[in-house]
């Protein structure tokens, strides 16, 4: 039986990545969809070889600067030896898309706060990562809740 993903649903998702290519380009971990809210439950980072670090952030709207595509850092691991694991299990949520920009940055009213929640644009927000060195090899396991409020 297929998993229901329509409006009004809430499902637990998991995604697994083996990041061993030889570059340090930004990598999309979760791609936001309009009127969805993503609550990340855990990110497990396993160093397959000795690794410099891994940086994870949300790429989205900055409610202070009123800027689109801002990198809001969540964590950066320390260097890990081969076979070591870093677990980030602080819960956080982010909206699937950016809001309509408001002109009185920083956020100062309930109406502006509602604009953020309304997700009135189609500009996706992302959970992203990048590794510290092109020789780093990371295995990631991400568990999250996807709430579809369309």
Regions found by a protein language model. Give the residues of each.
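Compositionally biased, low-complexity repeat tracts
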Residues: 2-4, 65, 77-79, 92, ...
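Short, surface-exposed beta-strand/strand-loop-strand elements in extracellular ectodomains
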Residues: 50-76
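A short acidic, glycine/proline-enriched capping/turn motif at secondary-structure boundaries
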Residues: 83-84, 134
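Beta-sandwich interaction modules
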Residues: 84-126
């Amino acid at each position: 039986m297929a998993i229901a993903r329509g409006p009004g649903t809430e499902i637990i998702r998991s995604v697994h990545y083996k990041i061993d290519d030889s570059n340090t380009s930004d990598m999309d971990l979760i791609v936001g969809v309009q009127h969805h809210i993503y609550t990340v439950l855990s990110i497990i980072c396993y160093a397959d070889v000795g690794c410099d670090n891994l940086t994870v952030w949300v790429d989205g709207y900055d409610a202070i600067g009123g800027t689109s595509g801002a990198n809001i850092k969540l964590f950066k691991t320390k260097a890990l030896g081969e076979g070591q694991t870093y677990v980030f299990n602080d819960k956080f949520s982010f909206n699937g898309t950016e809001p309509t920009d408001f002109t009185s940055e920083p956020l100062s009213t309930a109406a502006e706060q509602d604009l953020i929640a309304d997700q009135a644009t189609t500009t996706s927000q992302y959970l992203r990562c990048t590794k510290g060195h092109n020789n780093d090899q990371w295995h990631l396991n991400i568990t999250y809740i996807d709430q579809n409020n369309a």
